[in-house]
Design a protein with these regions (language model features):
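Short, well-ordered beta-strand elements within core beta-sheets of diverse protein domains
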Residues: 40-46, 61-67, 151-152, 262-264, ...
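A short hydrophobic/small-residue beta-strand
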Residues: 176-178, 354, 441
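Structural signal for hydrophobic packing residues in well-ordered secondary-structure cores
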Residues: 62, 66, 81-88, 92, ...
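Residue-level signal for inorganic ion chemistry
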Residues: 37, 73, 95, 174, ...
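N-terminal Rossmann-like NAD(P)+-binding subdomain of aldehyde/semialdehyde dehydrogenases
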Residues: 1-138, 332
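ALDH superfamily catalytic-core signature
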Residues: 10, 235-381, 444
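Conserved C-terminal structural/oligomerization subdomain of aldehyde/semialdehyde dehydrogenase
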Residues: 38-41, 225, 317, 367-489
Length: 489
């Protein structure tokens, strides 16, 4: 693919099956969220037969790939990551067009893949070390086996970063991969695979594009698929779990969140703190699983907090992400925008206070695209959809509390358990309270995966997911324990 900012032509991508790039008679069109009449490109509308061939190719390639040591596989993977440092500006322009990110967000995601995954490769030496212990009349050893064929299904909001959080650990562990990119934002991810595929043996990584309704069941029920790694919505995960249960496949899920942020009376309301909080809420137009989705603030500081927070939010510049002055792009789809507007309207009907903020320099462009201004909703009912559901949009509800234990209880009263945060100048007290949040990843005075040490895992509990990404735990998601015991006379 060639993507030039000043000479734009639609990109027509292909599928990768058994080392061969292939197409199909039908195509899926990809349009720009900022300019919905602009065709960004197309991908093949793959069929179940394409999935069958990709799985067969992955299965055939897996034994030889698995026969290498972790260190040998790491040596093969390392040059892939170096390749992914190239063409960032060109690839970012494509990413912005198909996704709606800002240029800064697109560059950060693309550049973050090699830097993060180099840390994954550093774990190879640790993985090569078996654990052993005395056993009755002999010795016992603990080693690890790959699952085999892993299906990787990723969403549109961060497809490149999230895909490689699955692909690299899976490959390092000795698995082969069948990747299903998101149908509304597949091009940047396929471009990345084009860059690395020549360095891998045929069949080690395969790419099948298509509509979930047409190829999803084959991907998740096929008897030769040993594990499914999925990032996406809870309803889709339930269907995947049901499909995977037919053959008891391994499964890793990274799902939605409704993360609370609890401010204490002594919370820092200065510019830097408010910018960190606003970034967590409005990054990627609020279309992030681990982000602040609800704010709980003491009644005593509600006014001061709202003044400080809205002053920061009002500086956000909304528009086409190809403009480097823009700090928040459009919603990804018209359907997502309609839902966001509906749940905000519902809150308003319940007498909530809705503040529409931000700067819109290009008002004509704003009207054409799937744009929405950053919004703060206060005085909201606890059972309003904006509070209860994952809104996945640039709007955040604010509720007040008098007793911090009540705030913790309300924060935990959800099916979600991805992230949560406590904001206070008293780090010790905030840390103690953060540990009371029923979430897999918790924070003090910050909120988001970018704040987590990249050598450590993150993930959700409850209905926000199963398993972990990153760190040694993230690699072992793609490994199975094998215990070997010898009897020695």
């Amino acid at each position: 693919m060639t993507v030039l900012r000043n000479e734009w032509r639609p990109v027509h991508a292909r599928m990768l099956i058994g080392g061969e790039w292939t197409s199909s008679s039908q195509r899926i069109e990809v349009f720009s969220p900022a300019r919905p009449d602009e065709l960004v490109g197309t991908v093949p509308r793959g069929a179940p037969d394409d999935v069958e061939r990709a799985i067969a190719a992955a299965k055939a390639a897996q034994p030889v790939w698995a026969s290498k040591s972790y260190s040998e596989r790491a040596q093969i993977i390392a040059p892939l990551l170096e390749r992914l440092t190239g063409d960032i500006d060109e690839r970012a322009a494509l990413f912005v067009r198909e996704n709606g990110k800002t240029t800064a967000e697109a560059r950060a995601e693309l550049a973050g893949v090699p830097s993060r995954q180099r840390l994954t490769l550093e774990l190879a030496a640790e993985l090569d070390q078996p654990h052993e212990a005395d056993a009755p009349n002999g010795r016992s050893f603990v080693g690890y086996l790959p699952f085999g064929v892993v299906v990787s299904i990723v969403p549109w909001n961060a497809p490149v970063g999230l895909a490689f959080l699955q692909i690299i650990p899976a490959l390092l562990a000795g698995n082969t991969v069948v990747l299903k990119p998101p149908e509304t934002c597949p091009l940047s991810l396929i471009r990345a695979i084009e860059m690395i595929a020549p360095l891998l043996p045929a069949g080690v990584i395969n790419v099948v594009t298509g509509l979930p309704a047409e190829i999803g069941d084959t991907l998740t029920t096929h008897p030769d698929v040993d594990k499914v790694a999925f990032t996406g919505s809870i309803p889709a995960a339930r269907k995947i779990m049901a499909n995977a249960a037919q053959t008891i496949k391994g499964i890793t899920l990274e799902l939605g969140g409704n993360d609370p942020a609890i401010l204490l009376e002594d919370a820092d309301l200065g510019d830097a703190a408010m910018e960190r909080m606003a970034k967590s809420v409005y990054r990627m137009t609020g279309q992030v699983c681990m982000a602040i989705k609800r704010i709980y603030v003491p009644e005593s500081i509600k006014g001061k907090f709202l003044d400080a927070f809205t002053r920061t939010v009002d500086k956000i510049v909304v528009g086409d992400g190809l403009d480097t002055n823009v700090t928040m792009g459009p919603m990804h789809t018209a359907r997502a925008l309609d839902r966001a507007q509906a749940i905000i309207a519902d809150a308003a009907r319940r007498d909530a206070k809705v503040q529409v903020l931000g700067q819109v320099p290009d008002k004509a462009g704003f009207g054409r695209g799937h744009f929405m201004q950053p919004t703060v909703v206060s005085d909201i009912a606890e059972d309003a959809p904006l509070m209860v559901e994952e809104q996945f949009c640039p709007a955040v509800p604010l509720a007040t509390y008098r007793d911090v234990d009540d705030a913790i209880a309300r924060a935990n009263a959800t099916i979600y358990g991805f992230g949560g945060s406590v904001w206070s100048r008293d780090i010790g007290r905030a840390t103690d309270l953060a540990r009371k949040l029923r979430a897999g990843t918790v924070f003090v005075n910050t909120h988001g995966t970018e704040s987590v040490n990249r050598k450590l895992p993150y993930g959700g509990i409850k209905q926000s997911g199963i398993g972990r990404r990153a760190g040694i735990e993230g690699v072992r998601e793609y490994m199975q324990v094998q215990t070997l015991t010898t009897f020695e006379q």
